[in-house]
Amino acid sequence: MLKRRSACERCRGQKLKCIREPDNRTDSCLRCSQAREECVVNLRKTPGRPSGRTNSSSRRSPPSNTTPPTQTPTPAPTLVHDDSDSISVPRNGSFASSSEDALEGLLDMNIDWGDMNMFSLSGNGADQVPEIPSSLFSFAESTRVEPPPPCASWSASGDFAAPTGLFPCQIRNEICDPGIQLSGLQQSLSKHLVQLQSFSWDITAVLKLESASFGFQTPESLCEASRSFNPLVGTFEIISEFENVLEILRNAVKRRERQEVPTLPKEMLICYSLTAISCYLQLVCVYNNLFSYVLDQASSNLAVRTFVLDSTPVISLSGFVIPSPKNIVGRSFAQLMQHKIGSVEAALGLPDDWRISKDLSSHQSADRPLLLGGKEGQALLELLKGQAVEGESLSSAMGLLESVRDKITEIECLA
């Protein structure tokens, strides 16, 4: 049951509801109790009662001798309201000076948020819930809480709830951003290149020829002797990641064209192109390291050279053994490496002098070149031809590409 009672001086001075326990009406209010302050109630002046603040003990709430009417108890707590409607919490503008005042006002209400009965519809219902300043939900009136930044995919997602804390749409956009993914790809390539330069690997285990028709194995199981480090598996995983990033970028451009949205700015495309070329040159450095290692081992280690030249599976025709040519391992290795990188070269739209793969017919893309096929891309490649490649002794990018092509030819002609 709601019963009007005078508010204490502290609650009245700060224009807040004076809330008391329903069973202890004569004790201090909840707000003064938590603040450990004296709860002084300034009753209306009566004859013979002195004015002022000298006799504070006489201004405490006297115990009520009147017996309240008998009523069925309800689970909703009884809240003591202020006797003046003019000092209730204002809604529009009183707390708009700063969000700090509004938040302090809400915290000073001493609402027991764990008591779900205070929101019960029994009794007088909504009258039992204290008013909350509307400035808490107004970004325009706040000086400390900044409004959320605009998010393009928010309205399209169908989520009409106001964002608080983290913004999942922004996190998704950052994860799917091609620029961030290309930067991550650069880090993976650098780490893989350091591993190639630091660790040795068993060529006879990694380049072992097996028949795919008899128990085809996964790439992770191809290198049993040196399972801890298989350079081909790591290289092909990076190439697959490279293809996925380029496909995401291609789909983003196509989606903008279908929706008649302005295409990506030229500055952004140039930034993507530079990062993609950097990733491609790092991948060529990985290839250069792999081919150099195989050639060095084949020239210095007789067992490796014999394995590369003579480890040919027996092939029969009508029951007769067919003499197999030499260096099947070396030529198969060179062909596989060219086939893998050819898909990346086609997706980038690289011209012939920038490619190391020789079979161009198997990677002809039906779509137009994405990054480097236009005039801007060709001009960018012309500028980069003379640039030095970091970490390589070769003088320029074109020198690196030419060196890798020569090593591929040397591996194919070991016999």
From Swiss-Prot:
Record GO terms (molecular function): DNA binding; DNA-binding transcription factor activity, RNA polymerase II-specific; zinc ion binding
DNA-binding region ranges: 8-39
GO cellular component entries: nucleus
Region described as Disordered: 41-99
InterPro entries: Zn2-C6_fun-type_DNA-bd_sf, Zn2Cys6_DnaBD
Chain segments annotated as coiled-coil in the UniProt record: none
Stored CDD domains: GAL4
Biased composition (Low complexity): 48-69
Biased composition (Polar residues): 86-99
Superkingdom assignment: Eukaryota
Location, primary (coarse class): nucleus
Keywords recorded for this protein, A-Z: DNA-binding, Metal-binding, Nucleus, Transcription, Transcription regulation, Zinc
PROSITE patterns, A to Z: ZN2_CY6_FUNGAL_1, ZN2_CY6_FUNGAL_2
Subcellular location, record wording: Nucleus
Expression triggers: Highly expressed under trichothecene-producing conditions.
Role, per record: Transcription factor that regulates the expression of the gene cluster that mediates the biosynthesis of butenolide, a mycotoxin that shows antibiotic activity but does not seem to play a major role in the spread of head blight in wheat.
Protein name: Transcription factor FG08080
Organism of provenance: Gibberella zeae (strain ATCC MYA-4620 / CBS 123657 / FGSC 9075 / NRRL 31084 / PH-1) (Wheat head blight fungus)
